[in-house]
């Protein structure tokens, strides 16, 4: 995955996720750094300079996945007939699962509702395992 810096200030992209830890060190505007994820799973990605910069990467081991359209609809094509567990994830909602049976006809409708009412921002530690310095009111981004 490539992490491009198009901002007029430096970044330091890192993750302390168990099986996919990495640190791209500090890099400036116009630079791009890359990382190859070794294991499937959720990777929380942060910037060691900007505590509110957060990204989530779902590393998948198979080909049966998708990202929904802006209206929430999604399609996963070319699924062989059989029984499957659909897993739906969003950073602000608990994961939702549905058992799905795909027939030879293919098309299956599934309704999924995510509930983000319990979401709370939780501060994370920097790449050294320490709190970020308090700069409230001094941010320039």
For each predicted feature, which ranges?
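Extracytoplasmic copper-binding redox domains, predominantly the cupredoxin/blue-copper superfamily
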Residues: 1-141
């Amino acid at each position: 995955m490539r992490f491009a810096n198009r901002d007029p200030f430096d970044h330091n992209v890192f993750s302390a996720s168990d099986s996919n830890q990495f640190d791209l060190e500090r890099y400036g505007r116009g630079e791009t750094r890359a990382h190859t994820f070794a294991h499937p799973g959720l990777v929380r990605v942060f910037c060691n300079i900007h505590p509110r910069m957060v990204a989530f990467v779902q590393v998948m081991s198979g080909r049966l996945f998708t990202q929904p359209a802006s209206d929430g609809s999604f399609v996963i094509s070319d699924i062989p007939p059989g029984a499957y567990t659909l897993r739906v994830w969003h950073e602000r909602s608990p994961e939702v699962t549905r058992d799905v049976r795909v027939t030879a006809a293919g098309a299956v409708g599934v309704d999924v509702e995510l509930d983000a009412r319990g979401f709370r921002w939780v501060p994370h530690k920097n790449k050294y395992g320490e709190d970020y310095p308090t700069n409230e009111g001094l941010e320039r981004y």
